[in-house]
C-alpha cells in the first residue's frame, strides 16, 4: 500500500536507487496504490552516470509491496520491500533489466515488457 511520501526501491537499471511517491494516478482522491498501479515519483538517490538524475520527477509502476495482496483464488502474497520500475512517456521501462520478482498484477496493467524482463513473476 503506497501513498504520498512513501519511499520505494528501484527494481531496474535506470540509474535511480530510491524514489519517493508524490501522487497516485487514477482518480482525483485516490490515496493508495498497490502492485500494477502507476505513480508519480521523485528520484531521491541516483547513480552519477545513470539515465535519471536526483530530483527528477518520473512516472513509475509498482512491482512489489510489503502490504499483502489478496488474490481472487483466496491466496495472498507479500514482498520484503516496496519497489517500482521507472517508465518513460510511452509507459515502457527506461531500464533494460529488472531486478527481483514482480507481482502478477503487473501483467494485468498491460506492462508486458516488464513481465518479460523480470526474472520471476509471482
Swiss-Prot record:
One biological process term in Gene Ontology: translation
Cited Pfam families: Ribosomal_L14
A GO MF label: structural constituent of ribosome
SUPFAM superfamilies, alphabetized: Ribosomal protein L14 (SSF50193)
Functional summary from the UniProt entry: Binds to 23S rRNA. Forms part of two intersubunit bridges in the 70S ribosome.
Annotated organism of origin: Campylobacter lari (strain RM2100 / D67 / ATCC BAA-1060)
Assembly notes: Part of the 50S ribosomal subunit. Forms a cluster with proteins L3 and L19. In the 70S ribosome, L14 and L19 interact and together make contacts with the 16S rRNA in bridges B5 and B8.
Family membership noted in the UniProt record: Belongs to the universal ribosomal protein uL14 family.
InterPro entries: Ribosomal_uL14, Ribosomal_uL14_bac-type, Ribosomal_uL14_CS, Ribosomal_uL14_sf
Gene3D superfamilies hit by this protein: Ribosomal protein L14
A Gene Ontology term for the protein's cellular component: cytosolic large ribosomal subunit
Protein name: Large ribosomal subunit protein uL14
Entries under PROSITE patterns matching the protein: RIBOSOMAL_L14
Keyword tags: Ribonucleoprotein, Ribosomal protein, RNA-binding, rRNA-binding
